Amino acid sequence: MPTVRKLLNEQDFQEALERQLRIRVFEGQHLVDNGTVIIRLDGDTVITQKSVSDITYHSRRDCQFFEVRK
């Protein structure tokens, strides 16, 4: 069963970016992205990529981010 850890601070996000960790993204109560990696981030936005043509922009304020480890 996978282990899930919430990304809470800048250090968590930087680790996920540098180590290319797979994450899940929730907006409200809805899962909007799963199995994606962070390719860029700033204070307001997290940009994720699942495949070559699947790039998504997520608001840090409106979304919750979770690292998924198997």
What are the residue ranges of the model-derived segments?
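Conserved RNA-binding domains used in RNP assembly and mRNA/RNA metabolism
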Residues: 2-70
